[in-house]
Regions:
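Intrinsically disordered, low-complexity, charge-rich terminal extensions
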Residues: 1-163
Length: 163
């Protein structure tokens, strides 16, 4: 079985960043070789700090009603109480998505571009849309390219280009 990994990269050209999802086979090229190769091509890896992760959450509540937050993992395993509260809020969002506001409030302590306290987020389609994606803070991406193109790229574009 051939499992391809995907990694999100940004490329700066004409005074703005563009984003691409690069697939790679870990049996053919190592992670470090991939990073090195793309650096030589003037691309940089996208790291998802907590601020970017929360911007993705806000996007599901404000601009993009096609996708919802299905799971979120805090990086520190010592903070079980916070993780349990987050899990409860996300569970409540299944019946009342307006609880996303509670989730954003619960995460306000880590809304920082120097924080990586949110280690992963899972986004799924709603209303019969079965697309799903999981994003790790190191920019590794599991999921549908449709979510990447239609949901994640617009958030990254606003965040990195100030649009």
């Amino acid at each position: 079985m051939n499992v391809e990994n995907k990694k999100i990269f940004k490329h700066f050209q004409n005074n703005c960043y563009s984003f691409q999802l690069i697939s790679y086979d870990a049996k053919k090229i190592s992670y470090s070789q991939l990073i090195k190769k793309l650096k030589q091509e003037n691309s940089r890896q996208v790291l998802f700090n907590s601020e970017v992760m929360i911007e993705l959450i806000k996007e599901t509540a404000i601009n993009n009603k096609e996708y919802i937050v299905a799971a979120l993992k805090i990086g520190s395993e010592d903070d079980l109480e916070v993780q349990e509260n987050i899990n409860k809020i996300i569970l409540s969002m299944r019946t009342d998505y307006s609880n996303v506001v509670r989730l954003i409030e619960e995460l306000s302590w880590c809304y920082d571009n120097e924080s990586i306290d949110i280690s992963e987020i899972k986004i799924v389609g709603r209303g019969g849309n079965y697309d799903n994606a999981k994003i790790l803070s190191n920019g590794i991406y599991f999921g549908d390219e449709e979510i990447f193109n239609n949901f994640i790229v617009p958030v990254l574009t606003r965040y990195f280009n100030g649009e």
